[in-house]
Amino acid sequence: MDPSGMMNEGGPFNLAEIWQFPLNGVSTAGDSSRRSFVGPNQFGDADLTTAANGDPARMSHALSQAVIEGISGAWKRREDESKSAKIVSTIGASEGENKRQKIDEVCDGKAEAESLGTETEQKKQQMEPTKDYIHVRARRGQATDSHSLAERARREKISERMKILQDLVPGCNKVIGKALVLDEIINYIQSLQRQVEFLSMKLEAVNSRMNPGIEVFPPKEVMILMIINSIFSIFFTKQYMFLSRYSRGRSLDVYAVRSFKHCNKRSDLCFCSCSPKTELKTTIFSQNMTCFCRYSRVGVAISSSKHCNEPVTLCFYSYCLRKIYHFLLWNLKYKIQKSVLFS
């Protein structure tokens, strides 16, 4: 159907009735809503009347072209809007996918961390030994752990022993603090030890004065004293027999007295002359006596050749032997006392 024919066949019509849009750029109050959809210059011609020059056929043709162009423009706009919507949707979808991936990664990391935490807790529980008791939070002043109970019992025992020591040591109750208490106890014990040593020394000295016999000496030196006593007893008996026999009917020649500085002898000591055999015996005995004196570290060194030209009698030797005997006894007693004190 030709729109121009239809328009010619019909009766008279008005363009304003057919085209409801404003003409010549003039709009009414009711056309404000329509202008939002199709505005001025929408179809390329600002004034259809001027384009048709008053010819209805041209006006209809121009109107049809304008309608066709408006529809095609609307389609294009719809296509553009759909394309832009698709782009926006694709961008939003990509962003959503990225967010979902990130959320999934975070969730996976949390799940892995939780799984690792549970595994470590299980391993710790396996490594820890099973406790025989149930741990309960202790009240104030009370304990539930066996180790803490044992420690408390040990401390109570220590405090009891410290109290006993404080009661034993005089003046220790006034001291405050375990360290100071222990210092006081140590000082008191050391003073007691010194007193015991002093009393033991005093007792040994008293016993040595009261019982100076052989039983005081140790068993190693008892044999030496017994041998010396036996030798002296034999020597003194022979000396007495010799002097008694030699003095019968004979006069003893008295020689000048020689005082030996190292022996500290008195000046009233007499020496007697003997027969040649006796002189020979005395010289041999004097040499042996000199060796014995040097061995025993006594300050007496007797020799007939060095100290005097005359033979020495047995009286002089008896005197020296007595001195040696007393010196040995004194030396042994001193050694015994020293060993007892420092042992």
From Swiss-Prot:
GO terms for biological process: petal morphogenesis; regulation of DNA-templated transcription. It comes from the Eukaryota. It is found in: Nucleus. It holds the Pfam family HLH. Gene3D superfamilies: Helix-loop-helix DNA-binding domain (4.10.280.10). Disulfide bonds: none annotated. SMART domains: HLH. InterPro entries: bHLH_dom, bHLH_ZIP_TF, HLH_DNA-bd_sf. GO terms for molecular function: DNA binding; DNA-binding transcription factor activity; protein dimerization activity. Keywords: Developmental protein, DNA-binding, Nucleus, Transcription, Transcription regulation. GO terms for cellular component: nucleus. Residues 142-192 form the bHLH domain. Coiled coil: none annotated. Homodimer. Involved in the control of petal size, by interfering with postmitotic cell expansion to limit final petal cell size. This is Transcription factor BPE. The gene is BPE.
